[in-house]
């Protein structure tokens, strides 16, 4: 599990793209020239940007070779760069930085967010969506299973919080629109929840384990999910998935 799996990620493409659609709808820009899609993955969010601004120069950035290859194949009219978001530098100031479900993987948002704002044109926009599920059972149970089985904590850090992001971006010279939405995804089984998180949040926990250790981890994780997520009357499961949205526009 050394690299991301585009096929597994796109298994829930509609559910993963919906927050990007809703974030994009709140971006207050019309005619723009330069756009970056940070953590573009297989290009599903980049495609939305290209549809809205077909004449813009759109650059997708991702650290995964597999994801970049998939995005290039799907969107030949866009540019894609394999790079670490923290180190990537655009060739010119940007009108829009779009980051859908990517920045939560990176540390030290107190430095990262002002850095991203500095890459914008005057009145440019930073649009961010991040899963805010660190305290949801899906992610709490990952930590509990790892503790039970004496594996190191490899999960991501919790988000800084609404008030912190507002202060960070206000001090960076932005007007800030911030909101939180909880989606309730209809899942056919507990295994479907595992399939979902294996493509994203569960990756760091599994990537350094042997095949036998992975199976042991997933068996226990499945048992604990059954305890936390009861079946609905029709046999499905409602998976609560909170997400934090931020649209910050430079005022100078």
Curated annotation (Swiss-Prot):
Enzyme class: transferase
UniProt entry keywords in alphabetical sequence: Cytoplasm, Methyltransferase, S-adenosyl-L-methionine, Transferase
Recorded GO MF terms: trans-aconitate 2-methyltransferase activity
A single GO cellular-component term on record: cytoplasm
Reaction equations catalysed: trans-aconitate + S-adenosyl-L-methionine = (E)-3-(methoxycarbonyl)pent-2-enedioate + S-adenosyl-L-homocysteine
Principal location class: cytoplasm
Entry-linked SUPFAM superfamilies: S-adenosyl-L-methionine-dependent methyltransferases
Subcellular location(s) of the protein: Cytoplasm
Cross-referenced NCBIfam families: PRK01683.1
Function: Catalyzes the S-adenosylmethionine monomethyl esterification of trans-aconitate.
Family assignment from sequence similarity: Belongs to the methyltransferase superfamily. Tam family.
Protein name: Trans-aconitate 2-methyltransferase
Organism: Escherichia coli (strain SMS-3-5 / SECEC)
